[in-house]
Amino acid sequence: MELSEHEEDAGDVGGGCSSPPTPPHRVLTSAAPETIRCRYHECLRNHAAASGGHVVDGCGEFMPASTEEPLACAACGCHRSFHRRDPSPGRAGAARLPQLHLPASINSRAPPALLLPPAAAASKQGLPFPGYGTPSGGTGTTTASSSDERLRPSPVQPRRRSRTTFTREQKEQMLAFAERVGWRIQRQEEATVEHFCAQVGVRRQALKVWMHNNKHSFKQKQQQENRQEQQQ
């Protein structure tokens, strides 16, 4: 009785009724998303762009102003986008690409053309696309000096102050006012100074600077005129 059961099992195996092999399956695994911490260095904002010059404020590194305004720099007050962005120092980890896992049977039967040596694979990835990176469409590569020149900040140039120009009538009125107050603005005369500036059309700070710059020259000129009158 037991012999007949074994014979039936053997007949089932040899009859060709076995289930077909399962097709190879691919399993894609990707690493958890890793945050890239970027670091922002010196401020590259051109404060003299309106006048055609190039002046930076000299801020060396971005510092958040507060939790309410995290994108404003506490040192220079500029937006974070004006600072040079460098993701490499604060990078938490290299981004991992999805890995392709194949069954061992498929990897063992892979054609030789798909299994490239490490050196050949690296050289193949390093070749640029034709027509990209060179004017002639060749296979030239860009040098590291060009990228360094873009990232290198320009030297800080001294900011030129715009000089205020006065008309001849304004100079005569300011000279008469300066001689009347003794070439010195007192605190008791603030109302008089404000009224004079509004009447002549000059700013108070401009009047103060003009009196400071021309005080000695006009006094020397007046002294010379007095000496000439006494000699005559």
From Swiss-Prot:
Acidic residues biased stretches: 1-11
InterPro entries hit by this protein: Homeodomain-like_sf (IPR009057), Homeodomain_ZF_HD (IPR006455), ZF_HD_homeobox_Cys/His_dimer (IPR006456)
Query: What UniProt keywords are attached to this protein's entry?
Result: DNA-binding, Homeobox, Metal-binding, Nucleus, Transcription, Transcription regulation, Zinc, Zinc-finger
Q: What is its main location?
A: nucleus
Q: Do the record's keywords include Signal?
A: no
Q: Where are the zinc fingers (ZF-HD dimerization-type)?
A: 40-86
Transcription listed as a keyword:
yes
Q: Name one GO cellular component term.
A: nucleus
Named from the GO MF annotations, one term is: DNA-binding transcription factor activity
What function is annotated for this protein? Putative transcription factor.
Know the name of this protein? Answer: Zinc-finger homeodomain protein 5
